A protein has these predicted regions:
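Structural helix-adjacent loops and short alpha-helical linkers that scaffold large soluble proteins
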Residues: 1-8, 54-62, 135-136
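Non-transmembrane alpha-helical segments in soluble domains
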Residues: 4-8, 12, 44-51, 67, ...
Length: 152
């Protein structure tokens, strides 16, 4: 099966995601590195699925251990720098300003963001089309604002 067919059957259908668009490569394959279009609500469903360790409505959708493996940093993109962003399986791993909490995020072109903060049970989605933003700061700015809003 092609990736888009597999995702539609095994991931999107169980989550009730029906309105998707996946860009394709010149050979007709799904552009799986970043060509998926979802509504904000459906993107939040993916975040919630990760927040709940791959279980949706009592049913395991993702293999046991997949969430932990996919959000474990494999690459440090800015070694030795404060708040260095690390990368797992298509997830950016972001330490908070105080280093006490870690979030992970799917960051899309133009400001599309899915941020999950497991320790605080937060799933946040941002959509937009600011293709001129400075990519180094936006994920942290969003995370800092989320945490400030829920801090006592």
């Amino acid at each position: 099966k092609h990736a888009h067919e597999y995702a539609a059957e095994q991931l999107f259908a169980p989550l009730g995601i029906t309105n998707t668009h996946w860009k394709t490569t010149p050979t007709g394959l799904a552009d799986t590195e970043g060509g998926l279009y979802l509504t904000a609500r459906d993107l939040a469903k993916l975040g919630y699925l990760y927040l709940k360790d791959g279980v949706w409505d009592g049913r395991r959708i993702l293999p046991e251990g997949w969430v932990a493996r996919s959000t474990t940093p494999l690459i440090d993109t800015r070694p030795g720098q404060p708040r260095s962003r690390k990368y797992g399986y298509q997830w950016w791993v972001l330490p908070t300003r105080d280093g006490a909490t870690t979030a992970y995020a799917a960051l899309g072109y133009g400001g599309q963001r899915l941020i999950v903060v497991p320790e605080l049970e937060i799933v946040a989605v941002f959509t937009g089309w600011n293709i001129y933003e400075h990519p180094e700061f936006a994920p942290y700015a969003a995370l800092d604002r989320i945490l400030a809003a829920v801090s006592p």
